Amino acid sequence: MNPGIDLQGSFIELLTNVGLPPGVAKAVWMPLPMLLMLVGATIGVLISVWLERKISAAAQQRIGPEYIGPLGVLAPVADGLKLLFKEDIVPANADAALFTLGPILVVIPVFLSYLIVPFGQNLLISDLGIGVFLWISLSSIAPIGLLMAGYASNNKYSLLGGLRAAAQSISYEIPLALAVLAIAMMSNSLSTVDIVNQQSGLGILGWNVWRQPVGLILFWIAALAECERLPFDLPEAEEELVAGYQTEYAGMKFALFYLGSYVNLVLSALMVAILYLGGWDFPIPLNLVASWVGVSETNALFQVIAGAVGITMVLLKAYFFIFLAILLRWTVPRVRIDQLLDLGWKFLLPVGLVNLLLTAGLKLTFPIAFGG
């Protein structure tokens, strides 16, 4: 198997060749992955917001953002700057400490989850053995922040929105975890890199989507509910709750909720690409491509091109699902709260359990095809 590009080793070697001591070179490297993660996730959010505006406009036969930059690409940046300079208001009867802590608790766990998202064999910040388990654990922290924000606002609409967010998250966290467990069972690992490697070698035919079609649908529905996307945006339903738990927020605190929502959507789409669509894997096996071109897989130029193609593949697969999520907003009506909970507990949970048991049975019966 192609070992991929050792980004950390190459960077440290480059700095030591320039004349820096190895210790200093390692110290320079340490903050760079985190900075890259923050910048990359923020750019991903800006692209998603722009896509949402343009696709929504097309669905309604409008033009959408047009004048702020080419094709309106700078409109999300303008929104962020506007919110940055708006007054930060704390309601008179609110609990100021919890009111401030709420949006922080929502955003930080989502950004931390990007630690285990691989864009290539070695193109990730931390290849943890408990990768997907860490992601599910961190995603369960955000609802605490939403509930905290709703309670601290001292507003009935905010409180109802926070309670809805907590109920929704609990209802859909379990089906999501069951779908991930089925993938982990086939891969014999919780590491995101191992999960992608288990799908490599056969190109598109080796991807988990063919072995886990029900799991993919289950995962995506649960992920949309976790991201509070339509038709599951009950915690902030405008017609019912003004803006839900965000009602009393303004300025940067409101922007943090907005940012957290889209960062979570991009993260969920990336996880679909990694768990079910082969991650950075190209639809045609790279060893075949290398033999057709007439170069070795270990060729430095081929590795660089393969790394760039891998990053592109992950992003294309992820943004395809973001496109689907945006289309769903304008094609599916919002469900009622009882329908939302019934779907989670009475349908997705049993389907997830059956899918997990079926995967275990198939793994024992067909160990080669199902990662025995």
Curated annotation (Swiss-Prot):
Subunit structure: NDH-1 is composed of at least 11 different subunits.
Record keyword Chaperone present: no
Main subcellular localisation: membrane
Localization of this protein: Cellular thylakoid membrane
Domain of life: Bacteria
Protein name, per record: NAD(P)H-quinone oxidoreductase subunit 1
EC number, UniProt record: 7.1.1.-
This protein's UniProt keywords: Membrane, NAD, NADP, Plastoquinone, Quinone, Thylakoid, Translocase, Transmembrane, Transmembrane helix
Organism ancestry: Bacteria, Bacillati, Cyanobacteriota, Cyanophyceae, Gomontiellales
Record field: catalytic activity: a plastoquinone + NADH + (n+1) H(+)(in) = a plastoquinol + NAD(+) + n H(+)(out); a plastoquinone + NADPH + (n+1) H(+)(in) = a plastoquinol + NADP(+) + n H(+)(out)
GO molecular function: NADH dehydrogenase activity; oxidoreductase activity, acting on NAD(P)H, quinone or similar compound as acceptor; quinone binding
Organism from which the protein derives: Cyanothece sp. (strain PCC 7425 / ATCC 29141)
NCBIfam families (UniProt xref): PRK06076.1-2 (NF004741), PRK06076.1-5 (NF004744)
GO BP, sorted A to Z: aerobic respiration; photosynthesis, light reaction
Transmembrane segments: 27-47, 97-117, 128-148, 166-186, 204-224, 254-274, 308-328, 351-371
UniProt function note: NDH-1 shuttles electrons from an unknown electron donor, via FMN and iron-sulfur (Fe-S) centers, to quinones in the respiratory and/or the photosynthetic chain. The immediate electron acceptor for the enzyme in this species is believed to be plastoquinone. Couples the redox reaction to proton translocation, and thus conserves the redox energy in a proton gradient.
Membrane topology value: Multi-pass membrane protein
Listed GO CC annotations: plasma membrane-derived thylakoid membrane
Similarity comment: Belongs to the complex I subunit 1 family.
